[in-house]
Amino acid sequence: MKFFALFIYRPVATILLSVAITLCGILGFRMLPVAPLPQVDFPVIMVSASLPGASPETMASSVATPLERSLGRIAGVSEMTSSSSLGSTRIILQFDFDRDINGAARDVQAAINAAQSLLPSGMPSRPTYRKANPSDAPIMILTLTSDTYSQGELYDFASTQLAPTISQIDGVGDVDVGGSSLPAVRVGLTPQALFNQGVSLDDVRTAISNANVRKPQGALEDGTHRWQIQTNDELKTAAEYQPLIIHYNNGGAVRLGDVATVTDSVQDVRNAGMTNAKPAILLMIRKLPEANIIQTVDSIRAKLPELQETIPAAIDLQIAQDRSPTIRASLEEVEQTLIISVALVILVVFLFLRSGRATIIPAVAVPVSLIGTFAAMYLCGFSLNNLSLMALTIATGFVVDDAIVVLENIARHLEAGMKPLQAALQGTREVGFTVLSMSLSLVAVFLPLLLMGGLPGRLLREFAVTLSVAIGISLLVSLTLTPMMCGWMLKASKPREQKRLRGFGRMLVALQQGYGKSLKWVLNHTRLVGVVLLGTIALNISIPKTFFPEQDTGVLMGGIQADQSISFQAMRGKLQDFMKIIRDDPAVDNVTGFTGGSRVSSGMMFITLKPRDERSETAQQIIDRLRVKLAKEPGANLFLMAVQDIRVGGRQSNASYQYTLLSDDLAALREWEPKIRKKLATLPELADVNSDQQDNGAEMNLVYDRDTMARLGIDVQAANSLLNNAFGQRQISTIYQPMNQYKVVMEVDPRYTQDISALEKMFVINNEGKAIPLSYFAKWQPANAPLSVNHQGLSAASTISFNLPTGKSLSDASAAIDRAMTQLGVPSTVRGSFAGTAQVFQETMNSQVILIIAAIATVYIVLGILYESYVHPLTILSTLPSAGVGALLALELFNAPFSLIALIGIMLLIGIVKKNAIMMVDFALEAQRHGNLTPQEAIFQACLLRFRPIMMTTLAALFGALPLVLSGGDGSELRQPLEITIVGGLVMSQLLTLYTTPVVYLFFDRLRLRFSRKPKQTVTE
């Protein structure tokens, strides 16, 4: 009583307290960062190593395995995967959430150093690492195009000047430059000319290497001067290499130009990048795991004018893709929805109270509670994201509830003739415990969420804390500011209502009277209502499930898979064909893509869609339409998926979800993977089924006759060196320039390597100086070979990726895969498990029931403590089954799967619908204790007295959530499952709990009386 009086009779202090809360909230709002979702990125580090010309199996055994053994000992590694392809190995380390990325990076460098002695000596450089997840979609893609500069020169500008500068920007984790390679001098040898001159490929390599050296020459001094010695020991361009003497034949000089074509070109000619049908160099920028995407993009954009000045004017630097516009639009949509929700909630209050003066009070309480929450969000290190803003939108209906309960009770005393200050004090005292019970029990719902681990826990923590803080501030405001404003603003007389609102008032009175009559009948037929309640509890609704709603971020990512033996020239043609099909789609704004490098048979595409207001289809509908057109393209497949704000795991795949096969027996894995993949491809629950196992590449298998080699004076080292020199794009020398280092690349001229007959033209110089054709001591035949070798941990692995067809959920796909694996009878040597997002989905589904039970148990404990009763909390919790059924029916009606967002809605319903029961039970207990009423009379009176605030609070929550259900702008697919569950649950529970709660109350009261009828014991001294 004194607590309430302190604020009611000191209006200045109360107002200033509220102003202070509001000012702190405004300051916090201005400093809050903006993001699509809470920070939930796993710390990921990518280790890269190269050995040009080495086969995938060689890279896996000699490079990947030693590194994996060393890296696997690092603390906090939750997953380690690797992929080895031609001349390249990439190892992805995913760490626990609480692992500091910088500390992990130091451990990774130490592990690389420890494994260095076990790696091949021929590696051109030490393994390197990057603090970025390669499976994440780039946050921005920049393109360089020019009509005057070559692709190699553009790549040089991009990798030498732009990429290092961008990498230094706060938040940038990796800048991947694609579309070509660094400039180089390429030496294309003519086999017949070499044979005619008696020159071996090793002779050419040695001559070039010896002719281009960079060594210190020292200095000369006399008594007064010092001269630095400088020589022309370096060759920089193709024109300088052309006249180089590499051999003497019969006294005549054999120059490089006599046996080779020397050109200024690039290190790897098997690379191509394009943007909208034009050759381009791509800079794909990824953020650090802990970085804020909006701040990082803004920093990059601010740097672009400076970057443009560092490159020639003839080079066009453009932004081909930017993830931030749709994120900003989505957040703006939520902010607008929040404002609409506040307006609708205040309108509900006005319609019920029919007094402008009374409506001002909750109209002040709502913004104070919401704005004050921003201060706590800033102190907790949160951001303005879709989930935190959704929490505030939902909180609109909650924070007004407390003010409504207090205001309505005070208004009832005023209408009865009590003086304003006395009514404020008496009314607040009567409902203070009710408001406290509602708020604490609502906050209690979120305690299990705060204790939840893993990605779901991280994802939901900001939502739970934001909503809890808003409810806490609302509780404070409703017990301080609201009664003070009621005491000083409201009048003792019954307010005059406007004529146009009298109809609503009469309707409300009629509704209350009708409810009273129906409630009397219900209380006389409690068994029938009990059967209805039990039937609701027993109702089982089967609904599809998924991890996270499929978002439309306006960006698509596509992976190209062609025949594994395809040539680079053919693959480049496929890329161009696919890009044309996509570019012609009316919903597409921009297309970029690249292919080549160590994976000639694959490529990547990034597609930017037009803004939502310029297209009528969702991203998934566009994918479905394009899938039909792309299927007509022979010889290759393009798998499209919508880029999501959440992607789990470090695997790069061509689809959204992954199923990984592991085995310690590589042969068994290669035998069963095609069988499993083909089986999964037939399932209607899956789409775009593909695999990262590429073991059907074309290989030319050479078998040496060692006896013949020994007789001819040739060793294996010389033969292998021949093949590497001829076909390995061997980097044989380095050209040093002020800004970068470039390579001299030697190979047989591509004109002479169009078919396997090129091997017949190869020869080795033996120890007697004679040219011995390769065919003298080797036989060859075509065979299949792996284009990549994949590991997870230290086991051989193959990942099958898939998307979901329209109308199918992740739970459908998961169940179908489990059935298929059982039907196939896969041996125990091959183990299958979901990976990435699908794995988190499995873990989340297993914990959902426990989470809901924990929330209900927590609420029961809190209510039991508040009411000092085991029974009354059960009465209050009896409202939950109808709400849960209503939520699931609503999801079924809107064809929405049960996702993590829908789970939040269920948790919220646990907190929302029990408010009705709390108000009824609270007043019924008070009437029984002090009004000498029977339980039936008490609960009947409580239901009638609390009918208006129950309707007000329920409609406030309903209208607070309604704008999110009806919104269709950016990010709506993320928000709607939450609101659908809340609206469906509220409608169903409102229809039932007004009748079932009194029945349950009377049932437990009779039960209590039955067990309390015990003979009294006498105590004797």
Swiss-Prot record:
Disulfide bonds: none annotated. Its main location: membrane. Residues 30-335, 380-388, 454-467, 872-890, 967-980 are periplasmic. It is found in: Cell inner membrane. It holds the Pfam family ACR_tran. Signal peptide: none annotated. InterPro entries: AcrB_DN_DC_subdom, Acrflvin-R, Multidrug-R_MdtC. It comes from the Bacteria. One of its GO terms (cellular component) is plasma membrane. It is a multi-pass membrane protein. Residues 1-6, 354-359, 412-430, 491-848, 914-943, 1004-1021 are cytoplasmic. Keywords: Cell inner membrane, Cell membrane, Membrane, Transmembrane, Transmembrane helix, Transport. One of its GO terms (molecular function) is xenobiotic transmembrane transporter activity. The chain crosses the membrane at residues 7-29, 336-353, 360-379, 389-411, 431-453, 468-490, 849-871, 891-913, 944-966, 981-1003. HAMAP family: MdtC. Part of a tripartite efflux system composed of MdtA, MdtB and MdtC. MdtC forms a heteromultimer with MdtB. Belongs to the resistance-nodulation-cell division (RND) (TC 2.A.6) family. MdtC subfamily. This is Multidrug resistance protein MdtC. It comes from Shigella flexneri.
